[in-house]
């Protein structure tokens, strides 16, 4: 059973119920909702995304823009969400490979398949 979500975690999970969410978009959403006033908002969001990936509550998808993203698992998924450049549109990291997340209650890929 998962612990109750913080407002930041809940925002990330709720947004992920809608569609594949680009990492830069969730940072903008968190800022607009005033869920973090930290100057290190990107680091804060990245830490929560990483924890949710490790907990199996969200999954990561990635691919070059504008191609359809593909499911990414394991160490690659974790390394992508730890790259703070992925949280800004048109950064070098984002231009190489745009990273998305989705709430597993919306879309779940069996990692063993």
Where do the model's predicted regions map?
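Short amphipathic alpha-helical interface segments
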Residues: 1-43, 47, 54, 62, ...
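Short, amphipathic alpha-helical interaction segments positioned at domain boundaries
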Residues: 67-113
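Short alpha-helical interface elements
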Residues: 33, 37-38, 51, 70-78
